[in-house]
Amino acid sequence: MALRAVWLIRHEPGTPLGGTVKFSRRYPTVEKRAKVFNGMNYVPVPEDGPFLKALLFQLRLLDDDKDFVESRDSCSNINKTSIYGLSVGGEDLWPVIAFLRNDMIYASVPLVEQALSPRPPLISISGVSQGLELLLGVHDFLYSSQKNDTDLHSRLSQLPDLLLQACPLGTLLDANLQNSLNSLNFVSVTQPQKQPAWKVGTYKGKAQISISITENVKSMQYGKQDIADTWQVVGTVACKCDLEGVMPNVTISLNLPTNGSPLQDIIVHPCVTSLDSAILTSSSIDTVDDSAFSGPYKFPFTPPLESFNLCHYTSQVPVPPILGSYHMKEDGAQLKITVNLKLHESVRNNFEICEAHIPFYNRGPITHLEYKVSFGQLEVFREKSLLVWIIGQKFPKSMEISLSGTLTFRVQGHNRQPFDHICIGSTAYVKLNFRIADYTLTGCYADQHSVQVFASGKPKISAYRKLISSDYYIWNSKASAPVTYASLLP
């Protein structure tokens, strides 16, 4: 006798999607019970996008839906109830309660406390009547005294708090939401909302939300068969929410493209109020496969006044953005170097900055240099024993560049500067520094249109992305190098 999920969808003919999800609520604890009860026939509740598409198709509300579909339109499938089966991802989600009133689609998925094959009679599923009762109660609440769209928007903003009272943890207690509203109003009159201890004040001014996604890519490349190259992406989502009210509620969704790399090891700010269990259990220790959770990643929270990090995450991308090799060897008094870099074809070729630093420790100042560079320009800092290869904002069309040269140094006795305890002898590296704006290696982005704000006023929402290199090293393949772990190759 519980509900797995509830949706309110505005039917919008003529738009690309045909509708917009105005409200959705999932109950993870009920979902876990569904896994146990339904066994091998369990079908998870889909995200809003796939559910919206499947529901509009089943209800024949898509603008371009002109063809006859036997599984839906044949005489043997005439629907005499408001119960449907939705085909989502090749699986059949049943039962789904849905009906259309006043251009608003009301939908819910009740818990079936028994096996789904064969389908049990509807009269034996108590959650069906509960789902219908709740949806009708929501409809009555939205349109009982609604005069215009502003009133409707105001009532929609009250639904999260009302469902906490009327349907906690997916169990319906009272379908009359007006009773819950009266109860909340009574509490607000007798016990004014307290300022939380972690929030030092309230904001007054223009409403706005800023979301910034920064990904740092780390890499250690050795150019050796017996040592595996390593790379990892570490992301941070920073937010600044200027919203009026003591406890405004915001929900931000992080999305991935079809070929995006799933987010893992997600750590959230304490202001986040709830999370899908799939987000919490996604770990880099597990092997990434097609079944890995790939979003949307929804974060409902009550923001503090100051800028804060909403979450941190890692991701295992297939390849590093720039592949490189570094060969350095001593030839008498001279040092010969060769550096090759290749930008992976999947990476945006538009840098704010891209340069390679080639330091020479424990050798003294550079006295002579002969070099050949296929692209960019080379700057020489003789006293610092440093070469800086300025690549610029783009790689050439071939995506490959190279640098070769011969150097000599002036030995200053035992006081050679700069000094390093690791880069002794031929142990040396090239360090890449680059930054790409409006881009992430995982493809992660914040959809501004899916941000839900339950506060007074309509905020201006802005989103930013950037990829930054961090500890991006290419070690000399002709010498030993420090490694975090060795490969398991025989």
UniProtKB/Swiss-Prot annotation:
Which InterPro entries does the UniProt record give?
A: AP2_Mu_C_sf, AP5M1, MHD
Q: Which Pfam families match?
A: Adap_comp_sub
State its location(s).
Answer: Cytoplasm, Cytosol; Late endosome membrane; Lysosome membrane
Domain named MHD: which ranges? 206-476
List the Gene3D superfamilies: Mu homology domain, subdomain B
This molecule's function is given as:
As part of AP-5, a probable fifth adaptor protein complex it may be involved in endosomal transport.
Q: Which PANTHER family match?
A: AP-5 COMPLEX SUBUNIT MU-1
Name of this chain's protein:
AP-5 complex subunit mu-1
Q: Which organism is it from?
A: Rattus norvegicus (Rat)
